[in-house]
Amino acid sequence: MTEDDRIKLEPSWKHALRDQFEQPYMAQLREFLRQEHAAGKEIYPPGPLIFNALNSTPLDKVKVVILGQDPYHGPGQAHGLCFSVQPGVPAPPSLVNIYKELKRDLNIDIPNHGYLQSWADQGVLMLNTTMTVERANANAHAGKGWQFFTDRIIEVVSEHQPHLVFLLWGAHAQGKQKLIDATKHLVLTSVHPSPLSAYRGFLGCGHFSRTNKFLEQNGETPINWVLPPA
């Protein structure tokens, strides 16, 4: 069995990203994570959920891409989808502001949970550009190699799909614009939904209705942003 065979990854992504698992950065990233585990550090999300964004949204099903920075670093929060938390965990402040904008934009009632899996299941690729984090230590895994992998994911989906919407909230996400073919995709930008910045343009951005309008104009089914009970 090769190393590649042991990677639990949805087949379309596994094929599209196959060469990345042979790159030197990936070996270095694997060794870094092994050493962190050996040192007794708690890593989020749990191993089987690290690739949840890819496993939930196959490459040819992607309609929308939302970019986050790194996973939530509190116990029980992260499950591999940016901005989302596991059932039973209160919605973090940035997600609360996302809900506020959904209410303003589409009159969607604010849910009592923060589990966004249904968006991923409909074709929203919810990708953190750094895919792991150490407990209680935000950005601890930034610069360790994930950035090369997730940059390639952005390039692949931009190349592969005909009419996507990219939602780039905050300076970090907007730094990835160079990877996106803006001649065929809709790229929507705003400040981050964090309480520190949301009032400077995220609240009022209308990104959710604009996303669905673009999808419908291009013959795609719009996203149902209403979340089912978790």
Swiss-Prot record:
GO cellular component, one term: cytoplasm
Methyltransferase as UniProt keyword: no
Key word Signal present: no
Subcellular localization(s) per the UniProt record: Cytoplasm
Main location class: cytoplasm
Entry annotation: catalytic residues: 70 (proton acceptor)
Gene Ontology MF terms: uracil DNA N-glycosylase activity
A Pfam family reported for this protein in Swiss-Prot or TrEMBL: UDG
Leading EC class: hydrolase
EC number: 3.2.2.27
Alphabetical list of Gene3D superfamilies matching this protein: Uracil-DNA glycosylase-like domain
CDD domains per UniProt: UDG-F1-like
Gene Ontology BP terms: base-excision repair, AP site formation via deaminated base removal
Catalytic activity reported: Hydrolyzes single-stranded DNA or mismatched double-stranded DNA and polynucleotides, releasing free uracil
Keywords: Cytoplasm, DNA damage, DNA repair, Hydrolase
NCBIfam families: PRK05254.1-1, PRK05254.1-2, PRK05254.1-4, PRK05254.1-5, ung
Function: Excises uracil residues from the DNA which can arise as a result of misincorporation of dUMP residues by DNA polymerase or due to deamination of cytosine.
Protein family per UniProt: Belongs to the uracil-DNA glycosylase (UDG) superfamily. UNG family.
PANTHER family assigned to the protein according to its UniProt record, in alphabetical order: URACIL-DNA GLYCOSYLASE (PTHR11264:SF0)
Protein name, as recorded: Uracil-DNA glycosylase
Gene: ung
